[in-house]
Amino acid sequence: MSIKSDKWMRRMVEQYGMIEPYEPGQVRYDAAGHKIVSYGTSSYGYDVRCADEFKIFTNVHSTVVDPKNFDEKSFVDIKSDVCIIPPNSFALARTVEYFRIPRSILTVCLGKSTYARCGIIVNVTPLEPEWEGHVTLEFSNTTPLPAKIYANEGVAQMLFFESDEICETSYRDRGGKYQGQRGVTLPRT
């Protein structure tokens, strides 16, 4: 299994629309010239952006968090350029980018150091072969203070690994429950 390069990513975008929208370089400044958390293509990865749709966890109903029976009322929905995550809490968001993962590829997501160094952890499960959709992002605020996430700026890096052989059954083949997801997607069973 080998990691894929910037040249490979560009080719996959051109041939298969693997990442939409796609930024061929690293963007470090917004249109007004202000510094931002970078996004776009790096040597061996792609830095994704967070969209402006957030679900912030709240426990006002004092319910138990149950992945098999998740209560949608546990979240407050906001649409904003920033998201303030309460201390020791979390928020869900989605990528700006829509992904179409090739059958021979497994994609792993890692948080950006800019956020990690502030106690904000990004968690995403692997993107499996032939999965497609917006990626749902989970941000954990591990600090005792409110934490800020910026929409339309870099939040995590996707790494693409190619297998030595094609998988027998892809995510699409088995009818994965998150196939084609758009927007922030809550747990499904």
UniProtKB/Swiss-Prot annotation:
Q: In which pathway does it act?
A: Pyrimidine metabolism; dUMP biosynthesis; dUMP from dCTP (dUTP route): step 1/2
Q: Hey, which family's this protein in?
A: Belongs to the dCTP deaminase family.
* Record has Plastid as a keyword: no
Q: What's the catalysed reaction?
A: dCTP + H2O + H(+) = dUTP + NH4(+)
Q: How does it assemble?
A: Homotrimer.
Cross-referenced HAMAP family, in alphabetical order? dCTP_deaminase
The GO terms describing molecular function are:
dCTP deaminase activity; nucleotide binding
Give any Pfam family that matches.
DCD
Annotated GO biological processes are: dUMP biosynthetic process; dUTP biosynthetic process; nucleobase-containing small molecule interconversion
Residues at the catalytic site: E138 (proton donor/acceptor)
EC? Answer: 3.5.4.13
Is rRNA-binding among the key words of this record? no
Q: What does this protein do?
A: Catalyzes the deamination of dCTP to dUTP.
Entry keyword set? Hydrolase, Nucleotide metabolism, Nucleotide-binding
InterPro entries per UniProt: dCTP_deaminase (IPR011962), dUTPase-like_sf (IPR036157), dUTPase_trimeric (IPR033704)
Q: Origin, by domain of life?
A: Bacteria
- Give the gene name: dcd
Q: Which residues bind dCTP?
A: K112, S113, T114, Y115, A116, R117, T136, L137, E138, Q157, Y171, Q181
Query: Can you name this protein?
Result: dCTP deaminase
The organism named in the record is Cellvibrio japonicus (strain Ueda107) (Pseudomonas fluorescens subsp. cellulosa)
